[in-house]
Structures are given as structure tokens and as C-alpha cells.
Amino acid sequence: MAASLPLPASGLFRTYGAAGGGRPRRRQGLAAVQWFPPQDRKRFFSSSSSDTSSGGPSQSVVSDDPDDPDFPGSPVGQRRRRAGARLAKGRPSQIATPRRLRLRSRCPQKCSTPCGALEPPSFPNGNPGSLSPDLRVCGQPRDGGELGTSASLFSSLASPGPGFPAPEDSICTDPSTFLDAASEAPSNFHLPEASLDQAPLPCSQDAATGGGRFTRLAHQAQASLRSALFSFLDPGNPEDSELGTDGKNLQEFCHDRELVGRRLESPGLSGRGKKRTTDQDSCREIESQESVQIEYEEARGCKGGIASGKSNGPERTRLSRKRKHQGTAETSLLHHCQVTKGQKMEDGSCVTQDLTRLQNACSWTKTRASFSFHKKKIVTAVSEVCSCDTLAGSLSESLMSEYSHHPVQNRTSCALSPWHSSSMYLLTPLKTQQVTDKRTSDAEKLYGECNQVGPIPFSDYLSEEKLECCEKIGEGVFGEVFQTVTNHTPVALKIIAIEGQNLVNGAHQKTFEEILPEIIISKELSLLSDEACNRTEGFIGLNSVHCVQGSYPPLLLQAWDHYHSTKGSANDRPDFFREDQLFIVLEFEFGGIDLEQMRKKLSSIATAKSILHQITASLAVAEASLHFEHRDLHWGNVLLKKTSLKELHYTLNGKKSSIPTRGLQVNIIDYTLSRLERDGIVVFCDISRDEDLFMGQGDYQFEIYRLMRKENNNCWGEYHPYNNVLWLHYLTDKILNQMTFKSKHNTPALKRMKKQIQHFYQTMLNFSSATDLLCQHSLFK
């Protein structure tokens, strides 16, 4: 039996990757299966069940998919049954992973793929729940298991994580090699910290009632249990499919989950029955059980077991008022239960480990689809978001710049064509509308955005000439991304299946209602390039949207096959769609290569300064125009492309300015978690109960999620532009600590510029918004 694989690294939130693996299994017509917990709760705490080829503990995501890269544990023998228990009929035996498999070339991994390092990131201060003041903690390990954020150029259409997908992506290219971390940030600077605590109670309409409070406590208990239990879940054979390769394990799968689902109703999770773990691992099992018990009691309001203390926010030099509803933050004990196994690997199991890494990376996108990462946007009126009392006590209220208070402008003249004018009015909630009428209304709105009266055939939109030059360049749970040429200009086509019954890459297809906000958000930010009062070209351009019908064109399937044979695909081959299947095709401009892949390719630190300047200006314009927060601006969502322009121009509140390009233009993508507002309508993604998103470790990206939650007190409908500052701080950290430049800092000008960026890094958290930074900070003077 092959040796167990190590515990996973921090699972970073991504939509797709270029990792290859075993050929994806096609599951035509597979209906969604209701979630049921597995039967044997002893599997929750088996220390051998948490092993994988990645290098550190991961509690960012929970999964019931045996292909989950966070939990592809060691081969498992037949499960012992308890005395008096009935033996399930027709239960197939589990087969151990073969010791040797044929060698396959390893596809390059992006540092956001959950694989690599064989140990969890070290925390010099001894507290795994927070980041060390030393900025080098955020660096990447040297063995290829980097813990950077998602490098995807496109994100799937619905999710928080990282997120859910959004249709605002562009072109993806091959990933670059991994980078050895080099920390050059000031040693005396303290990173902002937000403890791995329970979330503040999410703001909702039931908050004022006793029933609402009970509901929130129940949700917290469920989230805590889910995160703890499935972090230690034994998935069995990592090569098996979600319900068995041939579907024969479906009955056992659902039966096991149903039994454990009943047991989880009570807090009595302490071990009963025989143990499957070794003596060496039994103490870890008991510790894990006690942690889950404490988490359960904490969610129910039980006293004792957890020491409470106030979590510290970013350090400011100015005064700020205390939050009215500031509560104590309790550090979760789940993160103290993380362990790694130093088992010796035989020569033959190295091949298995390499192959499993590829399979794990490919299944990561399907994992996200199974656990609340693909939610629809919430559309509501400004007056219905959380109370202004919470906003008044936010971390940054006392620092709000005068530029942040300008009302959202009525920006676009209604005399323009529909595609060149705002469509936010289409999202106005109609509470009195019937369900059937609403679906028809949503379809009509979408067809209106497409300038169609109904779906058109694939061939009417994609001519034979366009199809012949199509090349697949990216993918996600949402679907596929192809590059083609339109009017002698390269464009990216994002193809998303909608309104169908079949699962697509493990996720339900979106409806007209769910896809419409994604389209309109991309359109609103793209339209900022045409505005007068607040103008920027820093957001990816959306050229057109079409709704097509039919099966996948053969030439696109050929492009899909070529991508799979050269890079490896995590998606199912899209050949199972019927003739009546609907697709949304979003045509984006060419966006370039993401910052993560360019981390070794930039010419000098001066180029990095231009990148920071362009991103800050784009966010500032979006703040002034749309009260915009990106909320997931990791370096995989920053695209760079070459430009011959010496300067880029933007307009903020009527004032025109320019930025030196240094030969590169920045495009921001992926509005999955974003929040924007216009004409009294707010569109946002409510992640208040997605506890797994806030429990990641090993990268500064995870700390940003927690700091955002602390800033807005877990009310995600509110406007808090300070969240944009937090993401700019994250990007500056990446530039200083994890990027290398072709030209070293050997000239006085470059040395002076590096010191300016270091000063920017040290002082930027004292500013209230991207607008405040752009107008007031010395780096941009």
C-alpha cells in the first residue's frame, strides 16, 4: 500500500488553473445530489485521512468530493464495522492506490493551486491564528508549494474565493515558474492582524427578533462543525470519482452521510467505538474531537473552553472612533489542531505523489462548486442595507476623505445606445412579481442586453472563420474561455451554459436571474472608460454579450482537446450538451497576463510603481462613480499587457491626470465578491456566513478577508472603501516580497523609488480609501 501523503497547504480560492491531471470524467445528465454527511464519524478525526500532496493545513474549504485536493488521503483498507451493525448490501470494496503508475510530465502549477509544500507555514510568534510581524512570513516556500493567491485570469460566474465567478475576465497564458521568496520589506513594520475568530453576527432583516438571533447561532454552529469535521475527513481512494467512478457507490455514499447527519444534531462528538488510527495519532484525534466539541458549545452560547479577547485591527496614526457594536473576538481552537505527518516515502510512492498532485489541482475547481462558492449576487435598495449605526463606527469613518462623499453620479446620457448606457435599472427589485412572470421578465431583460429577441444558433454568432482560429486559453467552473480574432483584434470569449438541468463541472447552471447581475456589473465597470466626470480604462472591457443555443461546435471541442492534451483540463469535456442548451457568450478585450505570472518578468521597480499607480487610480474612479469595492483583488486578478502609450489618462471628479505606463497597461478583472451602487440600487455578494473563506492561513490574502469582515462588521451590503486600501496593501506586499526584477536596484533613482514604495507600504493603512491614497499620498505626487 502506498504511503500516506502529507497534509495539504492552505487551499487558496481560485476559479480554475492550468494544472493537468487525469482525464476528467464526463457525468452526462448527472443530477445534483443533496448533501448528507458520511456515516463513520471516526473518519473525521483519522490523522491519516487528511494527507495530501500539498504542504500545509487547509481549512479554507470543506468538501465531500473524494477528488478534493485538500483531502486526497492515503489508501484506505476496508472499514471496520461496529458490533451488531448490519453489513450494507452490494458495498464495493475500496481499492488501494497502486504503488507505481506510469510517469507523466508534471504541468507547471500556479502558486494558488493547493499543492506543493510538505509543511504548514511557520509562525515565528507561535500563534498559528495570526500573521507574524515579520513580513517574510508571507513569502513563498522554496519547494514549489507556494501559498500565493489565485492566478486565474478569469473567475467563474458566481462565487466568493475566493469567490464565485464573474464574467469580466480576459486572456490566460501559460503559467510561469515558481518564485523563491525574497523579503525586502521593513522589519519594524507590523502587518495588520485579524484573529481567526468567529464572524460578527451577519446583518439581516431578522436581526431584531429573537428568532433571528437563534437562527444566526444555529448557522454559526453548523459552519463551525462543517469546517472542523471535514478538515479531517478521509476521502478514500483519491482516484475515485465523487460518487464512485461508475456511480455504484451512490447508495453507500448517501447512506453514510444520512447516518452521520443525525449524529451531528447533538454535541456529543467524543469518540465512541473502536479507533482506526494508530497509537501515534490517537492523541491528535482526541484533540480534534475536543476542539469540535468546544466550537459547538461556543456557537450555542456555552461558557468556558475558549478565551476571549479583542482582535487588533490595522495600526493607524490618526484617531478613529470605536465601533458602537464592537464585540469580543474569540480565536477558534480549530487552527491549533493542525498537524503534519512526517512519514517516510518509499521510492515507488514518489511517482504516485506527483500524479496525485496533478489530479488534486484539477479537482479544485469542482470542489468550489460543491460548497457555496457560487452564489448569486444580492440586489437591493440602498435603504435596505445594514443600519448606518454600524457604518458610523467603522474603522475608517473618521478618516473618510472629502472625495469619498460625492454622491454617485448619473453618468451616462440616456440618448446613447442601450449597449453604451447603464443597465442598472434592470436590476430594480420587483417584490410583487410572480415567480413565473419574473423568470420571463429576467429572460427578456437578458435578451435586451444581447440586442436579441431570443437565442440565436451558435453558427450565427461564431462563423466558420472565427471558429477555425479559436484557441482555448482558460477555464473555470463556469465553463470555457477561448481566444479568437474579431476585426483583426484578439478577443476572449467566455462561454457559460445557463438554464439547463445538467451539472457543468460539478456546479448547477445559472439562471437568467443569476447571470444578469454578472453581466451588468461587468458592463458598468467597462463603461467607466467612456465617462467624462469619472473615467478610467483600468477595468477589463466588455465588447458584447450574446445568448446562443445548440450543442458545442466541433471546432471548439477540438480546441478543448488540444488544451487538455497540452496543459491538462479540470473540466468535463463539453460534448454532452443537447441542441436546446442555452449559452451566454461574453466577448472581452484582450487583457494580458496576470501579475502572479509576471512576478519574474518585470523590468524594474519603476514598472511596479506604475502598476500600483494604475490600480489605485482605477479603484479611486470606481469609488467616486459607483461606490465600488473589489473585495478580492489578489494578484491573479490584475492583468498586464504591453502598450505603446507613454501615459494613460484618467479623470477623477472632473480633474484629468496621467500616469506613466512604463510599457504596461493594467486591467482589473473578476468582480465575484465586488460591491457597487448606482441610482439607489446596491449589488453585492453576501459572504457573512461563509466561515471557510475567513479561516485560511499561510498567505496575507486570507488575512485581508478577515480584516474586511472586521471593517464592515460582517455587513457586506454597506460601503467601506477602506477595503480597497487593504487590497492595495496586499499587492504592495507582493511587489516588495515576492517579485524580482530584471534590473536590480543599483542606481540612485531605483533605490530612491524602492524606498518610496516601502514608505507607501508602511503608511498606506492610515488612509481611508483608494481616492484618499491617490490624492494625498506622496508616492503619487
UniProtKB/Swiss-Prot annotation:
Residues 46-63 have a biased composition (Low complexity). Residues 1-102, 261-290, 303-330 are annotated as: Disordered. It is found in: Nucleus; Chromosome; Cytoplasm, Cytoskeleton, Spindle. The keyword Nucleotide-binding applies. Constitutive activity that does not require phosphorylation. Specifically inhibited by 3-(1H-indazol-5-yl)-N-propylimidazo[1,2-b]pyridazin-6-amine (CHR-6494). GO terms for cellular component: centrosome; chromosome; cytoplasm; nucleus; spindle. GO terms for biological process: intracellular signal transduction; mitotic cell cycle; mitotic sister chromatid cohesion; mitotic spindle assembly checkpoint signaling; protein localization to chromosome, centromeric region. Its EC number is 2.7.11.1. Keywords: ATP-binding, Cell cycle, Chromatin regulator, Chromosome, Cytoplasm, Cytoskeleton, Kinase, Magnesium, Nucleotide-binding, Nucleus, Phosphoprotein, Serine/threonine-protein kinase, Transferase. InterPro entries: GSG2_C, Kinase-like_dom_sf, Prot_kinase_dom, Protein_kinase_ATP_BS. It catalyses: L-seryl-[protein] + ATP = O-phospho-L-seryl-[protein] + ADP + H(+); L-threonyl-[protein] + ATP = O-phospho-L-threonyl-[protein] + ADP + H(+). Its cofactor is Mg(2+). SMART domains: DUF3635, S_TKc. Residues 276-287 have a biased composition (Basic and acidic residues). GO terms for molecular function: ATP binding; histone H3T3 kinase activity; protein serine kinase activity. Residues 467-781 form the Protein kinase domain. Serine/threonine-protein kinase that phosphorylates histone H3 at 'Thr-3' (H3T3ph) during mitosis. May act through H3T3ph to both position and modulate activation of AURKB and other components of the chromosomal passenger complex (CPC) at centromeres to ensure proper chromatid cohesion, metaphase alignment and normal progression through the cell cycle. PANTHER family: INTERLEUKIN-1 RECEPTOR-ASSOCIATED KINASE (PTHR24419), SERINE_THREONINE-PROTEIN KINASE HASPIN (PTHR24419:SF18). This is Serine/threonine-protein kinase haspin. It comes from Bos taurus (Bovine). The lineage of its organism: Eukaryota, Metazoa, Chordata, Craniata, Vertebrata.
